[in-house]
């Protein structure tokens, strides 16, 4: 749970949240040296999606895809900052992240269903995996993200050039990626009003 004081400042959309989360992680590393396996964030995509798309987690927003992707981007960034700090601290353990990944399939072989599956895969998997494992966002992933955001009448998120080095360094230092897998999704093309 996000402390209310940080939620009031924007939660995962705020740079103050990122700085506080990094400081908390550094404190934990020093305070608990006997811990040898660290997870920076568990299921960040679930958190952001439920905060800004389904509205089931505070701040309980619905269909705010740009904010969802910005929160995801910020979570990837602070994850990278934490990995880099852990490795710079010379701690003897291992550090990683846990993603909830969902295999996405088109409902049919139609071009529309295939594209719908690509969009959902970018939303559920690619955006996180690009930042975590590749240390950069591919043009294809960003094009799909932009399409989702613009289809919902919102503006593209801010991706800063200076963050790329932080992400790239962490991707090379990451010890493991945990995967929580619950189910697959089959996607069908749809061009109507969002029903969430």
What are these regions (language model features)?
Residues 1-196:
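Active-site region of glycoside hydrolase catalytic domains
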């Amino acid at each position: 749970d996000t402390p209310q004081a940080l939620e009031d400042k924007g939660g995962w959309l705020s740079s103050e949240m990122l700085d506080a989360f990094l400081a908390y992680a550094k404190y934990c590393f020093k305070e608990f040296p006997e811990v040898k396996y660290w997870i920076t964030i568990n299921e960040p995509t679930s958190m952001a999606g439920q905060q800004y798309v389904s509205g089931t987690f505070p701040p309980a927003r619905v269909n705010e895809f740009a904010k969802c992707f910005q929160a995801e981007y910020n979570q990837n960034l602070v994850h990278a900052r934490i990995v880099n700090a852990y490795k710079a601290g010379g701690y003897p353990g291992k550090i990683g992240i846990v993603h909830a990944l969902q295999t996405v399939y088109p409902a049919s072989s139609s071009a529309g269903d295939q594209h719908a599956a690509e969009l959902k895969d970018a939303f559920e998997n690619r955006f996180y995996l690009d930042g975590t494992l590749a240390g950069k966002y591919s043009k294809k992933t960003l094009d799909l993200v932009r399409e989702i955001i613009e289809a919902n009448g919102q503006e593209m998120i801010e991706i800063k050039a200076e963050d790329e080095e932080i992400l790239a360094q962490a991707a090379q230092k990451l010890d493991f990626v945990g995967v929580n897998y619950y189910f697959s999704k089959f996607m069908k093309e749809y061009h109507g009003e969002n029903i969430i």
